[in-house]
Amino acid sequence: MRTLWIMAVLLVGVEGSLVELGKMILQETGKNPVTSYGAYGCNCGVLGRGKPKDATDRCCYVHKCCYKKLTDCNPKKDRYSYSWKDKTIVCGENNSCLKELCECDKAVAICLRENLDTYNKKYKNNYLKPFCKKADPC
């Protein structure tokens, strides 16, 4: 079952260290990252771009902006380590870029948790992303 979940996360095309990001989102929100955020709003998941639909979607927009600021690592491929201590994400890298990558993922997971009350099922499977309005630059 766990292998199936990991494969599903990989197929969604979410950027970053997919396994770690997925775990963080699950730990912080209790929601399945693929089914809950894989195609949410204009910014969550694959092809994410556009003016955020709500605070949840804004978390994903800010996350993409965070990735754009990383210069010496590849958010789509590089892997990092973190731990879950006392219900808190602790990034554990000595490499500064991997630490920043982990912090980007940590921030989006916490943001999604803090905005669970704005989660709107009508944006859950938004496959009309090409019709999202252009967002302000990061």
Curated annotation (Swiss-Prot):
InterPro entries: PLipase_A2 (IPR001211), PLipase_A2_Asp_AS (IPR033112), PLipase_A2_dom (IPR016090), PLipase_A2_dom_sf (IPR036444), PLipase_A2_His_AS (IPR033113). One of its GO terms (biological process) is arachidonate secretion. The record marks L128, F131 as: Membrane-disrupting site (MDiS). Suramin binds at V34, G45, G48, K85. One of its GO terms (molecular function) is calcium ion binding. Residues 1-16 form the signal peptide. Myotoxin activity is inhibited by suramin and varespladib. Inhibition by suramin may be caused by (i) distortion of MDiS from both monomers impairing the membrane disruption mechanism by the toxin and (ii) surface electrostatic changes of the complex that interfere with the toxin membrane dockage process (putative-MDoS is partially hidden). Inhibition by varespladib is probably through varespladib binding to MDoS. The record marks R49, K64, K68, K76, K77, K129, K134 as: Membrane-docking site (MDoS). It is found in: Secreted. Keywords: Disulfide bond, Myotoxin, Secreted, Signal, Toxin. Varespladib binds at N43, H63, K64. SUPFAM superfamilies: Phospholipase A2, PLA2. Expressed by the venom gland. GO terms for cellular component: extracellular region. It comes from the Eukaryota. PROSITE patterns: PA2_ASP (PS00119), PA2_HIS (PS00118). Disulfide bonds join C42-C132, C44-C60, C59-C111, C65-C138, C66-C104, C73-C97, C91-C102. Gene3D superfamilies: Phospholipase A2 domain. It holds the Pfam family Phospholip_A2_1. Snake venom phospholipase A2 homolog that lacks enzymatic activity. In vivo, it displays local myotoxin and edema-inducing activities and is lethal by intraperitoneal injection. The myotoxicity effect is weaker in comparison to other myotoxins, probably due to the formation of high molecular weight complexes and to the oligomeric conformation (conventional dimer). It shows specificity toward neurons and myotubes, but not on a variety of other cell types. This PLA2 excites a cohort of sensory neurons via ATP release and consequent activation of P2RX2 and/or P2RX3 purinergic receptors. Belongs to the phospholipase A2 family. Group II subfamily. K49 sub-subfamily. This is Basic phospholipase A2 homolog MjTX-I. It comes from Bothrops moojeni.
